[in-house]
Amino acid sequence: MDSRERVLVALAGERPDRVPFALGFFSQPLYGSPDADELFSSDVRFVEFDPPVEHAGLLDYLESLPDDVHVGSPAQLRTYGEWGYHPETEAEHALAYAGSPDDVVEGLLPDLTDPRRHTGLTEDVRALHLRRLAVAGAPPSLGGELFESAYRLRGFARFMEDLLERQPLVDYVLDRLTAMLVRNVTVLAEAGVDVLLLDDDVASSHGLIISPDTWRRFFRPRLGQVIGAAREAAPEMRIFYHSDGDFTRLVPELAALGVDVVNPVAPDCMDALAIRRKHGPRPALWGTVGDASLWDRGTPEQVREEVAHRIATLGPAGLLLAPSYDLDYAPRENVEAFVEAVLEFG
């Protein structure tokens, strides 16, 4: 099998010739390379929307920073400014003042319909397919989440109050965000990506941030709308869902909505083996390997042992191995051990 076939088979819950791997779920610079997945020849490459034209200079600044300076995902930082979200300065949130839908002034939310945001996207996907690589694509940050985008626009504490006291406003904001997301996932589907990356951190290490009933009331139907639009545009595309923390309680409901693969299933938050025993190889698992201490302070042999254990207990069907945490501070020899172990044991 080539990489594209391998990933598509694994994410369908079937058995590939070996377990595929990636270095995360977005393109990230490591060890002087702009793309860790290219550097280590993983099975997946990632495409993304271009930054807004008026903010494109930020990318030049980010790329000029030393390798040991980490300021977050460039894909996130490029879009924060236009949404009025400035966590580094704790500036007021764009919709902090709103008490009802009538208070949301037209034009405060960014226009995501500019075709310049996805110029060349189809060509990028086609070029990667010619290399027989699987291609994953995510909507732009803030334009690609529901829960996270809403609380960043309102402020976290204020949005928690909204869910109880200002539900018409919540519905209005989430409907606007859902419309943006539907358009963005349709663009990605029509560009030909193999895996649609949906990302919404609804959990902490101790469980869901909001109750399951609140998630079902506000977020499940809208997520279903997004997935439905993606399926209509590209029926064979795999649907990926990421949340930090422990979202075990949502796994069966995500699968019922059409999610094919969940991520990162971090071992210090979720029990991947219990999920596998309960649900089988669908949804597939993307991630599962190591907590932050393993990657940052563990030895290459410990990484190898973790990979071998994951393959033996979770694989080979329905599994794509990846670090369950960012690799910003991981020694290169640990990442090399991960790749070598996947190829040896997978």
Positions of the model-derived regions?
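Catalytic cores of TIM-barrel enzymes
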Residues: 1-346
